Amino acid sequence: MGRHILLAFLSILALAAPASAKTAAKGPPRGDWTHVVASTPAGGFVLGNPNAKVKLVEYGSLTCPHCRAFDQEGVPTLLGKYVRPGQVSWEFRNYVRDAADLTAALIARCNGARSFFPLTRALYKDQPVWFGKAAGTPKEQLEKLADLPPQRQFVAMAKLAGLDAWAAAHGLPAAKSNQCLANVKSVDQLVHMNHDATEQHPDFAGTPTFLINGALVKDVASWGSLEPKLKAALGG
């Protein structure tokens, strides 16, 4: 990842002071589709029935307060009422807004599909703590990160935000999390996912953004406004 890209993320941070083609579909364990998760060709992770009538995609940022509100207010109902019985599948695609967001995304994705959703939800729960630390870091200290080798930039960002200790407390030993944070290919993938989102969806207006069966849903950023759209797509 180039210096100019990291600096762009740092400037934003300062302002903030079906299953995958790679994975064969299987029936749900114990009749619960929330136990079925896979990676997707778009770089996201999908939870639920790959043959669900309604396929929901969320573009989310881990430092976005509206995304956190959706996670807390809407995801429990989304999972329990719609994903579990197989009516809706839910794909989450990271859309990174800043350096802290990218760091958190690398940690959430570190163990692949099996732990992505639990880690993502835990990061949202604790967002005020770790993002608060990142946003409170002096600008001069953040800018020094860009002078580090690419393999060390996000390891250092994790320490500033307390995400190194957070990862260890959530089952990712330092050796594992540091390996993921130093993976330049994973960083490049997240950057390309941002590009793909805006390239494929000209009306993309920030996070959270939702697609229902491939179509962008305009003017929807909360569970209260999304659920009626899901019901309509289900024919209810």
Language-model segment annotations:
Residues G2-R3, L211, P228:
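Intrinsically disordered, low-complexity peptide-like regions
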